[in-house]
Amino acid sequence: MTNTKYYPEVNSNADFAGLEREILKFWQDNNIFQKSIDDRNGELEFIFYDGPPFANGLPHYGHLLTGFIKDVYARYQTIKGKKVERRFGWDCHGLPAEMQSEKELGISGRLAIANFGIEKFNAHCRASVMKYANDWEEYVTRQARWVNFKNSYKTMDKNFMESVLWAFKELYNKGLLYESMRVMPYSWACETPLSNFETRLDNSYRERADKAVTVSFVLSHPVATTTGSFKEYRILAWTTTPWTLPSNLALAVGSDIDYALVPKNDVCYIIAAYSVSKYAKELGLSGEENFEIIKGSALQGLNYKSLFDYFENHPNSFKIFAGDFVVEGDGTGVVHMAPGFGEDDQILCESKGIELVCPVDNSGKFTKEIPDLEGLQVFDANDKIIIKLKEQGNWLKTEQYIHNYPHCWRTDTPLIYKAVPSWYVKVTQFKDRMVELNQQINWIPFHVKDNLFGKWLENARDWSISRNRFWGTPLPVWKSDDPKYPRIDVYGSIEELEKDFGVKVTDLHRPFIDELTRPNPDDPTGKSTMRRIEDVFDCWFESGSMPYGQAHYPFENKEWFEDHFPADFIVEYSAQTRGWFYTLMVLSTALFDRPPFLNCICHGIILDSTGQKLSKRLNNYADPLELFDKYGSDALRVTMLSSNVVKGQELLIDKDGKMVFDTLRLFIKPIWNAYHFFTMYANTDSLKGKLNFSSKNVLDVYILSKLKIAVQKIEESLDNFDTQTAYHAVSEFFEVLNNWYIRRSRARFWKSEKDTDKQNAYNTLYSCLDTMAIAMSALVPMISEAIYKGLHHCEERNDTALSGKSNVIVRKDTSLDKAISGVSHKIATALSVPCNDAISVHLCNYPTLSDFEINHELVATMDNVLDICSNSLFIRSTENIRVRQPLASIAIISKHNNNLKDFEDLIKDEINVKAVIYRDDLENYASKKLSINFPMLGKRLPHKMKEIIAASKKGEWEAIAGGLAICGETLNSDEYKLVLEPYSHIKGAASFENNSSLLILDLELTPELIEEGYARDIVRFIQQARKDADFSITDRILIEIISEFNLSKIIDNYGDFIKEQTLGEFAKNFTPDYVSKVELENHQIQLKVKKS
């Protein structure tokens, strides 16, 4: 009779990478991704915004991490019945593209680009910006992430750019834009200003050593003093930017700070009293002197002589003012003011009628206004300035100052602060509203809402959105070129441009947009012309415009956008609280008075195993594709998303992929092992599993209850955007399925009778695998698909994805009309699994098991049984007593023994003891010890910790309702733990049931017990020989044992047991199929086996 096999022949040692490649091909050939979208009618939608990456570099582990998270929730919401569009996007404009093009073209700087030609330069940017797009698609596809590349949006597309123009004009019309010359962080390497939040992006600060100089400024008039008169009065100022001193126009002091008048020869030095000791050497002090003290307010309004003659006649300058930013700390308590190079400096000086000077050009070099430094880069000018100060007699001290200093996030060069003209969004005008709208957002981790992001919003500054660069969306601002006839025009659409300029606009980029000019309507002479300002948008403005830009709103899809805004979910690295999340929030608040998203995950950063940033230079990480080819992408997905990195913390990953291998071994392989076990025995027995939850077998009810608990836990976790807990639920379930249910049910699978009990076992295991394949499909999409396809296999194909090995021909099963044949419609509905038409696990609906009731009492009791058994096995391991060695008894000391008695035989068999003894006199064997949670309690009661520790050691405490009383305080449940501790003379003991019960193993070995243990060893040796000889599990065998060790008594007493366990008969003088040599109690044993 032919053995009918209903399932693929599954390889226990699967090639998971090869399996995944077959799954990817299956998805592509059958258009599964698009089907998963089309199958949802759109009544329920999950709106997901995919933040646009730059495509001028390869994806790194951070991109993959973000992509895995995006994919998990998109897949999950899909099987929850929602339509989830996943449109990919590309960030195309800005410095990354320009810097790459400059490098490839061999040019550098704005002047070189202008000479090369803006049209040619931008054409190169356009061509190069998508250089790695195909590589991105390969990486993203290989990581099993489903996205729509064909309909991707690009920030350089005309439609996207037009929406950006609309947003700008909307802000302008709302009065939320202004133009100003303000001091900003400035990248002289890129020749452009940066937003204040760009200097707060990850890794933008570096430790840097600068020369700090203390300079003396000569006052124009004496200071009123009681200590006598001096030839000169000098006030000391300290700065870490000596290059700004040629532009000094004022000094600032703290009005309430005490300043000392320090005499040296015929000069009186003025310095904050707190700083005098730091200058003892330079001022010739012994430390015993007393000085006259005056308040900073007494210095206000005094004039001083300019250090240099560059701006000595600058109006209203060279005075001392009070500044509330001057505080005690580093320096001298006196701040030198260069309003062209400091934000506080500019604000204070402008309030005093002092116009700024800025003698530094776009490349960070001094201009002709400083003739003896002209053409010198500002940082290179420090030494020359210090020399000049010494020559003039204004120098007092130079020191090395090590501090964290902002650097350009593109070039890694130190920034300067420099006054530049720019257009600003009046963020400060509506920042309070942003704070309010932020409360509508669910942040993961939760503390981001009011801390990392919330505090950033509270301190938001006006946002500079213009950049004097080339490759970007142009600011739609035209100005009159004649200041006699001022006029500003702002455009918000291509239609408006075409109407005013009378030409067809096909490209909004420079230089084409710059060529649009027209006569100034406000000039009666007709001589002036309206010309576009040269600036382009900060690329962060464009990425912040992504929600409406991708839809070409409001020119198209107006109703669609308004129905799909805000997003249900976005995710990025936590530094984006200063980047994309922030710009989305600014523009969404200003334009729509709504939060841009409702749920946001801020994940952490991935570092190497030593905690260093992943770097090509350090060569400290593997190419992700290599890991995929070695271990599969599911393993990397689990490694990342089950770690704390999803909660904003760091993940350290080794270059060799050991962590990923461990995930494969400890998480993926157990899932596959359960599937392999089912298919192997089901094919051997020619039985099909059915989706059925009606078995009354206690193990079946238990595992089905655990299944529903796991399914609910996964659902609850993913609803709360918590992949860590979801993965734990999967792992915990398969631990119980493999190491308890399957192992305890093996006799049911092994027996020859195809009775109801055996079918129930197959149905139960099938139901577990099928249900979990769907429930965990978002978490491990590849292996879930392979298992689901294998369980529902109904077509003839050469399909590696079903088996985990190559070239396996699987028979056609025409009888499998329904994926859940034999199950009532009621149960099928409860599972919410589409029957015949779900060719992929990702086209199913999430299982609910609503008609199956969890047996909570059974689960609690069986969990206790598991706890008893695992603790007992741990004791055996600790005492070096193998599991095959029987023990006399186990004593279970508990108040809940009645529940455990039903499982006595199971406990005896699992831990290999002869008897179970039940007791309830726990006080005779153990006592409760108090364990204090010191970090937790120390926060609340720091002053009583010493007293509480002493009392806990003496046992001076009492358990009460709702907590624990000690030293007059009531401890909360998270501040302590009561640990059940056996008395010192009790051996082989362990607590269980949350430290409320105790078990004690009898560790004494009698001769009879030892003999039975040897019999069990012999069974193991024979079973291993069967496996090594590649016998089938159903083959009957002949056995011969040859040994110097006297086994006759063991064979006489336990021969029937050995034969039953091994399907064997003892025999002699046969030609063996396999011979093995083993060792028992230091004696050699030769074992011969042969198929009978």
UniProtKB/Swiss-Prot annotation:
Claim: Lipoprotein is one of the keywords in the record: no
Residue numbers binding ATP: K616
Annotated keywords: Aminoacyl-tRNA synthetase, ATP-binding, Cytoplasm, Ligase, Metal-binding, Nucleotide-binding, Protein biosynthesis, Zinc
Chief localisation class: cytoplasm
PROSITE patterns per record: AA_TRNA_LIGASE_I
Secretion signal span: none
Cofactor(s) the record lists: Zn(2+)
GO MF annotations in UniProt: aminoacyl-tRNA deacylase activity; ATP binding; isoleucine-tRNA ligase activity; tRNA binding; zinc ion binding
UniProt subcellular location: Cytoplasm
Catalytic activity reported: tRNA(Ile) + L-isoleucine + ATP = L-isoleucyl-tRNA(Ile) + AMP + diphosphate
Domain of life of the organism encoding this protein: Bacteria
GO biological process: isoleucyl-tRNA aminoacylation
UniProt motif 'HIGH' region: location: 53-63
Keyword Glycosyltransferase: no
Short sequence motif named 'KMSKS' region, residue ranges: 613-617
Annotated domain remarks: IleRS has two distinct active sites: one for aminoacylation and one for editing. The misactivated valine is translocated from the active site to the editing site, which sterically excludes the correctly activated isoleucine. The single editing site contains two valyl binding pockets, one specific for each substrate (Val-AMP or Val-tRNA(Ile)).
Protein family per UniProt: Belongs to the class-I aminoacyl-tRNA synthetase family. IleS type 2 subfamily.
Record's function text: Catalyzes the attachment of isoleucine to tRNA(Ile). As IleRS can inadvertently accommodate and process structurally similar amino acids such as valine, to avoid such errors it has two additional distinct tRNA(Ile)-dependent editing activities. One activity is designated as 'pretransfer' editing and involves the hydrolysis of activated Val-AMP. The other activity is designated 'posttransfer' editing and involves deacylation of mischarged Val-tRNA(Ile).
Name under which the protein is recorded: Isoleucine--tRNA ligase
Organism: Rickettsia africae (strain ESF-5)
Gene from which this protein is expressed: ileS
